Amino acid sequence: QWIPGQSCTNADCGEGQCCTGGSYNRHCQSLSDDGKPCQRPNKYDEYKFGCPCKEGLMCQVINYCQKK
């Protein structure tokens, strides 16, 4: 279980969340909604500035979620 103020990994975050942030400021955040900033899923499952989109949405080239 992730504790606010501590660094996380995706395994620490709950369902519908990812671990995002820089090296020293990682935190659990909800998956991105329509029109919200996002980061595309990657093979390392690491995110620096946002989570992937919620199901049914895709992260566009401009890094915002839109309906598929």
UniProtKB/Swiss-Prot annotation:
Q: Does the keyword Nucleotidyltransferase apply?
A: no
Question: Could you tell me which species this protein originates from?
Answer: Phoneutria nigriventer (Brazilian armed spider)
Segments traversing the membrane: none
Q: What is the lineage of its organism?
A: Eukaryota, Metazoa, Ecdysozoa, Arthropoda, Chelicerata
The protein's location, in the record's own words, is: Secreted
Keywords carried by this UniProt record = Disulfide bond, Pyrrolidone carboxylic acid, Secreted
Domain of life from the UniProt record: Eukaryota
Q: Which family does it belong to?
A: Belongs to the u-CNTX family.
Q: Name one GO cellular component term.
A: extracellular region
* Residues with the Pyrrolidone carboxylic acid modification: 1
Which tissues does it occur in?
Expressed by the venom gland.
Q: Which residues form each disulfide bond in the chain?
A: 8-19, 13-28, 18-51, 38-59, 53-65
- The name on file for this protein is U19-ctenitoxin-Pn1a
- Role summary: Non-toxic to mice and insects.
